[in-house]
């Protein structure tokens, strides 16, 4: 049941991760959870907003809707923003920016829409205070998110600022590294319950390994992050924020399984080690230079494998034969394992030659991809396409 201090929030995410985000929110204690497309809305209080920014693994950012306008014309656009009491949210001494998303027959140019809204806001400040806040599109203190669907414009405060996938640990990257939010979502979609060892056999800069370790020990992904835009809000409560941080930190647990990775590139191994150390997980993750195709499973116990095979410019090879080698290696050397592959090369994926247990549509950046899960057991049958 909601209290008077509760308000609605919206967590943005990637396509295909909405259910994972719902589950995360439910576990954190969110109320009135409603799944959308690439977003989930929910209800909580100020402390819960802080908690979500620190703890959610599959959220890109957390928005706080503050008002909504009916807008069809330029005049309505200007007057709506000019008449709203922005002084409750923006100081005349501060800076702000506006980001607009339009799904409407009435407006088609997001930059024009943002500019007109900005004019209404700054003219109000000029009238009230004879001066106005600055516009800063790079590093604003306050960021407004405008979402126009048909003639309804929802205005939200962006509480996060930089996307929440920017955990702060990735100092070194390779070409086209996987997004941290997507990696965390894939790990949770895989069904891994931390009851067996975890391997990324093509670990690149170590994103899957780091996210897996943080999930396994219940380590909040943005605990070490300092920059959140809600810290610039007029109602920011630093004492409450520290209480929330202390509370979620107390729930970090120990690691009972082995998390390890291979990469055939020494440079990638070195990059992953740097990132793992930055995340403070060097005592929980092992990385070795190794060619997956000549490796064998280290033991007979169950093993969870998750990886993002190189693609596009990353390796100039015959991808069909490359994926066939992946399937052959899994079948011959990694029985009693569950292997999850995320790839945008849907044609090459057919050549893995194993019967998949699960297939989920995702997007890796702008690339339509599939997360495909295989159960590898003695005598795994070839899949017939």
Model-derived segments and spans:
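C-terminal edge-of-domain segments
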Residues: 144-160, 372
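SAM-dependent Rossmann-like transferase core, predominantly class I methyltransferases
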Residues: 155-189
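A short, flexible beta-alpha/helix-coil linker loop
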Residues: 103-106, 163, 310-314
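Short, charged/polar, Gly/Pro-enriched secondary-structure boundary elements
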Residues: 47-54, 162-165, 380-381
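Conserved S-adenosyl-L-methionine
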Residues: 178-297, 313, 320
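C-terminal catalytic and target-recognition region of SAM-dependent MTase-like enzymes
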Residues: 291-385
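Non-catalytic nucleic-acid substrate-recognition regions in nucleic-acid-modifying enzymes
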Residues: 2-140
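Short beta-strand/turn micro-motifs composed of small residues
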Residues: 13, 263, 343
